[in-house]
Amino acid sequence: MADRVAIVGAGLAGCLLATLLARRGIEVTVYERRDDPRVAGPERGRSINLAISARGLQALDQVGLRELSLSRALPMHGRMVHAPTGGQSFRPYSADGAHAINSISRTELNMALLEDSERARGVCLRFAHRLRELDMTTGELWFETPDGPRQAAADIVLACDGAYSAARRSVTFQMGFTFSQDYLEHGSKELAIPPRNGQFALDPDALHIWPRGAEMMIALPNLDRSFTCTLFWTGEAFAALRTPAEIVARFREDYPDVVDLIPELADDHLHNPIGSLATIRCWPWVHHGAGCTLALVGDAAHAIVPFFGQGANCAFEDCVEIDHCLDETAGDWTAALAAYQQRRKANCDAIADMALDNFTEMRDRVNSPVFRASTAARHFLERRLPGRYVSRYELVSFTTMPYAQIPARMRRQDRATALAAAGLTGAAGLLAAVFRAGARHGAARRGAAAGTDQ
């Protein structure tokens, strides 16, 4: 008898994984706690636009959604940095300026994946099913629904239900399971810049950043010519603003160029929810019980902060890896899932660390003259040494090099450039010394000649 496969969560990863499995002839039931988003619509202030790059596009290509997704996205070729004075400075993502990350609404992409999975033969979607319990000894799943409790059973349970995974709770206190949840002191809140006279109010070819040291705001363009803004402030900073007047005054001081672009500034700031920012790590991701096997996928296994734009891209790579492992093991779930977690764990830890580091870069270092000079130097090396020197940002966003290999590659590159710089400095110093010695020798000869003439 074929394995009964259940996916918990019909978000980005859950829908993509369902389609990949269906293409293998595997029947899948997908359970989602929310109502069908095609009917209910998105939650207020909860979108945080996605930046889909090479890894995500490669995964979407596996199910034929690459071009459709790109048609619903806007390319961003660099960062537009907004100074407190209102000045702007464009910083391309790549040395040649040709590479772009793609801004797409989370809702838009989720809808496309949802509809694709629904069309796939063998996929059954169950909305308004909130998982309450997974019994690993029997393989039974218990759900809360508008019509009362519902029970289902599965041999394979794939937890794609996000950072606060209900499925993961069934193994949280098992012996040998390690789990960490590290929150930033910052939270996120969304604002909206509507079109201005039917046009974009800001340059749509860039990801806009307002770096302010301890905090920042970003804005990503949408197809309807609006921008989705996200504030990344500390809880204390959010709590300090209680009235519309205080909100407007704060923005006029620190974000003066956007005050007139956000007509609902005070209302959105007061009423949109504050999202938490956490890095979640756990191990193992795969658990075997007497009744079923549970595998954690995407944020359920490795939630990361959004500052490298890799959360969805990374989760999509998980789904593709599971599909590849099933290929390699001729459909043996036990062997496939064992290979999946071994291959992905180090990669996901690496991007989690890089995402945290990129937060400091975006809100603070990006304003530094030293950082700007360093970026210019890297772009120079990329142009001079194509393929041999590649920046970290390009390796993460524009290649599919395993995340875990990138830090070591950067260390090798940095050592090589440091040696090259030292060599150039040494050569320049030697030339200067030779020049000075030559000048002294010339002066001495001229002095001797003058003495002879006298």
Per-range role (PLM):
Residues A10-R23, L158, L191, G275-E361:
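Conserved mid-domain beta->alpha element of the FAD-binding
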Residues A22-G45:
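Glycine-rich FAD pyrophosphate-binding loop
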Residues A13, D36, Y164:
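Conserved Rossmann-like nucleotide-cofactor binding loop
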Residues E115, H129-E133, T138-L277, R281-G289:
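Conserved FAD-binding catalytic core of PHBH/FMO-like flavoproteins
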Residues V5-I7, V28, L294:
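Conserved hydrophobic helix-helix packing surfaces used for dimerization/oligomerization
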